[in-house]
Amino acid sequence: MSGGTPYIGSKISLISKAEIRYEGILYTIDTENSTVALAKVRSFGTEDRPTDRPIPPRDEVFEYIIFRGSDIKDLTVCEPPKPQCSLPQDPAIVQSSLGSSTSSFQSMGSYGPFGRMPTYSQFSPSSLVGQQFGAVGVAGSSLTSFGTETSNSGTLPQSSAVGSAFTQDTRSLKTQLSQGRSSPQLDPLRKSPTMEQAVQTASAHLPAPAAVGRRSPVSTRPLPSASQKAGENQEHRRAEVHKVSRPENEQLRNDNKRQVAPGAPSAPRRGRGGHRGGRGRFGIRRDGPMKFEKDFDFESANAQFNKEEIDREFHNKLKLKEDKLEKQEKPVNGEDKGDSGVDTQNSEGNADEEDPLGPNCYYDKTKSFFDNISCDDNRERRPTWAEERRLNAETFGIPLRPNRGRGGYRGRGGLGFRGGRGRGGGRGGTFTAPRGFRGGFRGGRGGREFADFEYRKTTAFGP
């Protein structure tokens, strides 16, 4: 390689240590990572070179391949860069593009996870390195030494600074090749699945660039070309496809959410009632335990009661109970008055109608045998469950139990279920309400019960 000619854009023949020959356009040389990148690469296989694993040639043309410097055996220049025709320095020219001379390097397209690569406007170091390789993944710190780009033309003058910088890169690359040094940064990148088809190296594993390189700070905005506009149109159409397919994906996701697992009770189809919760028997305190700001004042509470009146009333009650027990033990006219149901009923009727004791008198044995204190003691029938529960609530207070709500969804229609009206099990279908709920799903007035249709039950003896 001569020191005065830059080889960016030259056709390079590269032979790896696995005796595989590649041909492509020299893209860039990274001295930090000891890598060489070729664009439009084609593999010719091992050909007739002696090797343990002969590889046939391939017809595919790879967009770019990054080679590790320690695995390169030989690197020769097949064709020099094509001559560049620059426009005259005319201040009237704002922007220019060459479409015919860049046919071999246009239509690069987009590269999926690596982003869209701009097209080559010319075989210039700035357009090749600054524009395209910033989206591929080579470190951008080594890309700043390949020249600058003028703002009024699409070509670059190849200056002596470019050639000298390239000479330094090639010399350092030769030294690294002789030493056999490989970049430690590429070791974790060898097994990347995104570049297995696009990047091929001479080693057993394929290295893949992962870090997105920076653009050259000295290069200005690239000039648009016809292929660049075509790439933008292609991206616009791809974005429209994504926007159109997104509602379809959301619809499929919603449909998957609406699917009911097998064995679960289906919801009513003709639900008429909304959420009918809030009919709980006893309200559940959700604010936690009560917090008292100060201690209970027993002295002021005791001052509100008259101890003498309480003691007098208590002794009167004890005396009345003793008199009652004595009278029950003594027979009246040879018969126990409590055993005669007729006399008891008549006495009860007279006591209720006339009220001989008066409102302030609880017991007077001269007027009546019965008192006004324990009026429920003489009842022969047992109290009902509702009455006993009411008395317990009045005496001991209301127990605060969780999960006593009576509500739930009371939809009327479809093949719903009416489970959960009782305390535990359901009354229809397979749905069983949790224990303690009186509600639950109360659908199911239609369907199997035929509640919405008029019919007559016929028996063997007639309607």
Swiss-Prot record:
UniProt superkingdom: Eukaryota
Location of N-acetylserine modifications: 2
Main location: cytoplasm
Basic residues bias spans: 269-283
Residue ranges constituting the DFDF domain according to the UniProt record: 284-320
Motif (TFG box): 380-400
UniProt motif FFD box: location: 361-377
One GO cellular component term: cytoplasmic stress granule
Domain Sm: 1-81
Sorted UniProt keywords: Acetylation, Cytoplasm, Cytoskeleton, Developmental protein, Methylation, Phosphoprotein, Repressor, Ribonucleoprotein, Translation regulation
Biased composition annotated in UniProt, kind: Polar residues: 147-185, 194-203
Subcellular localization(s) per the UniProt record: Cytoplasm, P-body; Cytoplasm, Cytoskeleton, Spindle; Cytoplasm, Stress granule
Reported effect, residue 305 to A: Abolished interaction with DDX6
Disulfide bonds: none
Residues with the Phosphoserine modification: 178, 182-183, 192, 216, 227
SUPFAM superfamilies, per database record: Sm-like ribonucleoproteins
Molecular functions per Gene Ontology: double-stranded DNA binding; double-stranded RNA binding; mRNA binding; RNA binding; single-stranded RNA binding
Assembly description: Component of a ribonucleoprotein (RNP) complex. Interacts with DDX6. Interacts with EIF4ENIF1/4E-T; promoting EIF4ENIF1/4E-T localization to P-bodies. Interacts (via FFD box) with EDC4.
Biological function: Essential for formation of P-bodies, cytoplasmic structures that provide storage sites for translationally inactive mRNAs and protect them from degradation. Acts as a repressor of mRNA translation. May play a role in mitotic spindle assembly.
Family assignment from sequence similarity: Belongs to the LSM14 family.
Name of the protein described by the UniProt record: Protein LSM14 homolog A
Species for this entry: Homo sapiens
Gene: LSM14A
